[in-house]
């Protein structure tokens, strides 16, 4: 394993005329691949969950750097293994697929590209008059004015639609309710300054809640509250407007400032504004970071002139006239108080350090991943060690550089557990990632996965703390137990304490909703039932292929290893694992069958003269169909990405995630995207989501 990097530069310090690049690749893993299909699927699920939490909750599942790193690793794994992604993480223009809302944006609210340092330097060299703005750690909103009066405010959401938050942003500092007399839109960042972040955390702690992890999560959590608890604590900084679309950027911002808006640029110190060129401005801002009264993790460079912006144009996910620069990580010393273990959904041993809480770049770090046994032993980190905690473009938070010179004489090297800490069974140590294969050690993760919308039975409301509470009460030991729950049992499930010290329960109303979701889940297609069993190598893709090949759960259970191996993409080794796990899961499958869960229907032979499936070629083979971009607003809009994939295969086609010479049809919601351009180059037929929905309905494919 390669050691963690030893040389790190402070924020904003040029090195050899450039800025210090920082690359903390995970030792032994880097950007290469995941160890198994389960790890890859778990990573996708984690990223999708983090994307939703980013826009809608006060929980910091990942910050930007962690999310970007995980997304890059997912893409690297897919490329290395020839996987055609079924998720929309690479297509979304918001934060990784966050949910939409009830307000449609006039134009998509796009993210900014965050390229490597060399690309930022190249951008600055090409555009020496580019202007700089702080990259504020807040929440993007768009605000519509008619006749100078605020009429609508919405969160970014998925970039196309967002939640209406008009009444929750009235009176925000820097965001006037009346400004001018025209019709226009202003976009900007809703954020917490340091003083108001402290006030918000005091309110939370008085209510018996943990403080917000950082300012951005504080904004998300506070915006979700509609009772006025946090009134007057938000601030707003504008970064774009349509008030005069022919005006240069600086002129537009100055016009907004004259109307009473705070702009992002107006928050910068004069030393930054006086810098001679873009990279000098980045250096000046880096030197001033700790003196600002708000959290920022980077700088944004924007082309100033409207003419040059129009010439550069827009990409499918981000404008081409702006880039974001991420400052090198800030490090703070802390102490490893303990080394803790956890068993994940697939039985993987996860190891983390519990740290003396320390604020690193605006958020409190209390835990850090220690990756795996081999990494931890190679780094020789011990309980009681003083280490450096940092945030970088990796799975974070992380620690490195244990100070051996500060160790107590009684310090002992860390020893890994000899058996699973939960069930005392031996680990499978055949790979770098140790696993416990006993089912009881990963129930929580399996239930959450089984209930998920993206891959499982789509039981809304049953993940997270509710699932854990059911497990702790021994009401649920596997996915089949969900279908034997009673409404009264659910209503009495304890979820913690109320603000007054009482016991908070799920309640009858929420229990009734979940029971309705469980009943609905009984009719999910066979492929989702297979995937919900959380068996290795039975994720969404193979779940669909197994369901299509065997038709019923009974036929799948009766299949031989050789029959399983003949399914596209499975092969002998995976077939052996699936065959063995089907045997182990026989009691669970029996309970699901008894509960009335769909077990599929036998494949019927086509009737004489019957028409071929709608998405097949003249020779009867399935058409390779790729879907990219948003399908919102079309007849397909109610379907998740997995739902669209299932529709394609139900109609006889093969769902694919990338455009190639074998692609027969591209369903594209974003003309001009990379997949659109590649399909044009290859002469592949391209249709809109509306056209595709009509074609499938009419059978004229």
Swiss-Prot record:
<feature type="domain" description="BRCT">
    <location>
        <begin position="615"/>
        <end position="701"/>
    </location>
</feature>
<keyword id="KW-0227">DNA damage</keyword>
<keyword id="KW-0862">Zinc</keyword>
<dbReference type="GO" id="GO:0006260">
    <property type="term" value="P:DNA replication"/>
</dbReference>
<dbReference type="InterPro" id="IPR041663">
    <property type="entry name" value="DisA/LigA_HHH"/>
</dbReference>
<feature type="binding site">
    <location>
        <position position="133"/>
    </location>
    <ligand>
        <name>NAD(+)</name>
    </ligand>
</feature>
<keyword id="KW-0235">DNA replication</keyword>
<feature type="binding site">
    <location>
        <position position="420"/>
    </location>
    <ligand>
        <name>Zn(2+)</name>
    </ligand>
</feature>
<keyword id="KW-0479">Metal-binding</keyword>
<dbReference type="Pfam" id="PF01653">
    <property type="entry name" value="DNA_ligase_aden"/>
</dbReference>
<keyword id="KW-0436">Ligase</keyword>
<feature type="binding site">
    <location>
        <position position="302"/>
    </location>
    <ligand>
        <name>NAD(+)</name>
    </ligand>
</feature>
<feature type="binding site">
    <location>
        <position position="436"/>
    </location>
    <ligand>
        <name>Zn(2+)</name>
    </ligand>
</feature>
<keyword id="KW-0464">Manganese</keyword>
<dbReference type="InterPro" id="IPR001357">
    <property type="entry name" value="BRCT_dom"/>
</dbReference>
<dbReference type="InterPro" id="IPR004150">
    <property type="entry name" value="NAD_DNA_ligase_OB"/>
</dbReference>
<dbReference type="GO" id="GO:0006281">
    <property type="term" value="P:DNA repair"/>
</dbReference>
<feature type="region of interest" description="Disordered">
    <location>
        <begin position="603"/>
        <end position="623"/>
    </location>
</feature>
<keyword id="KW-0520">NAD</keyword>
<keyword id="KW-0460">Magnesium</keyword>
<dbReference type="InterPro" id="IPR001679">
    <property type="entry name" value="DNA_ligase"/>
</dbReference>
<feature type="active site" description="N6-AMP-lysine intermediate">
    <location>
        <position position="135"/>
    </location>
</feature>
<feature type="binding site">
    <location>
        <begin position="111"/>
        <end position="112"/>
    </location>
    <ligand>
        <name>NAD(+)</name>
    </ligand>
</feature>
<feature type="binding site">
    <location>
        <position position="189"/>
    </location>
    <ligand>
        <name>NAD(+)</name>
    </ligand>
</feature>
<feature type="compositionally biased region" description="Polar residues">
    <location>
        <begin position="1"/>
        <end position="10"/>
    </location>
</feature>
<keyword id="KW-0234">DNA repair</keyword>
<dbReference type="InterPro" id="IPR013840">
    <property type="entry name" value="DNAligase_N"/>
</dbReference>
<dbReference type="InterPro" id="IPR012340">
    <property type="entry name" value="NA-bd_OB-fold"/>
</dbReference>
<comment type="function">
    <text>DNA ligase that catalyzes the formation of phosphodiester linkages between 5'-phosphoryl and 3'-hydroxyl groups in double-stranded DNA using NAD as a coenzyme and as the energy source for the reaction. It is essential for DNA replication and repair of damaged DNA.</text>
</comment>
<dbReference type="Pfam" id="PF12826">
    <property type="entry name" value="HHH_2"/>
</dbReference>
<dbReference type="Pfam" id="PF03120">
    <property type="entry name" value="DNA_ligase_OB"/>
</dbReference>
<keyword id="KW-0614">Plasmid</keyword>
<protein>
    <recommendedName>
        <fullName>DNA ligase 2</fullName>
        <ecNumber>6.5.1.2</ecNumber>
    </recommendedName>
</protein>
<dbReference type="Pfam" id="PF00533">
    <property type="entry name" value="BRCT"/>
</dbReference>
<feature type="region of interest" description="Disordered">
    <location>
        <begin position="1"/>
        <end position="21"/>
    </location>
</feature>
<feature type="binding site">
    <location>
        <position position="326"/>
    </location>
    <ligand>
        <name>NAD(+)</name>
    </ligand>
</feature>
<dbReference type="GO" id="GO:0003911">
    <property type="term" value="F:DNA ligase (NAD+) activity"/>
</dbReference>
<feature type="binding site">
    <location>
        <begin position="64"/>
        <end position="68"/>
    </location>
    <ligand>
        <name>NAD(+)</name>
    </ligand>
</feature>
<feature type="binding site">
    <location>
        <position position="423"/>
    </location>
    <ligand>
        <name>Zn(2+)</name>
    </ligand>
</feature>
<feature type="binding site">
    <location>
        <position position="441"/>
    </location>
    <ligand>
        <name>Zn(2+)</name>
    </ligand>
</feature>
<comment type="similarity">
    <text>Belongs to the NAD-dependent DNA ligase family. LigA subfamily.</text>
</comment>
<dbReference type="InterPro" id="IPR036420">
    <property type="entry name" value="BRCT_dom_sf"/>
</dbReference>
